[in-house]
Amino acid sequence: MADEFESLFKISATGTDLNGHTGTADLLINATSASLSSEVPIDNTDVISAKTICYDLAYASEPTSFLQWAAENGAAGSIDGRGMLIEQAAVSFNTWTGLQPDTAPVIDWIATI
């Protein structure tokens, strides 16, 4: 993904262990299953700044352990995987029916439950 965006702005990406990483990240994506067992896949709080957005592919009715960790360590914001789930469902619906559903009301509604 970094290769696709490098012509637009400075970007670097890593899929490695961030526990020894120095410097802060603009975006941290948790694509592990750690949140499903209430674990946090990283201990290094030095990667978070007041500009860091944290995204967890997992979703739950309450913030995941990763998103709680992000908030506790000063991240600018956090997003869970519910929006991704809804958008993937919309693509599937469109593939099968040819109709494009309006996902905004669903995203708004699911945020309330």
Which positions does each model-derived feature cover?
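Adenosine-phosphate binding glycine-rich loop
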Residues: 57-113
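Rossmann-like adenosine-cofactor binding region
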Residues: 8-78
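NAD(P)-binding Rossmann-fold cofactor-contacting core
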Residues: 1-9
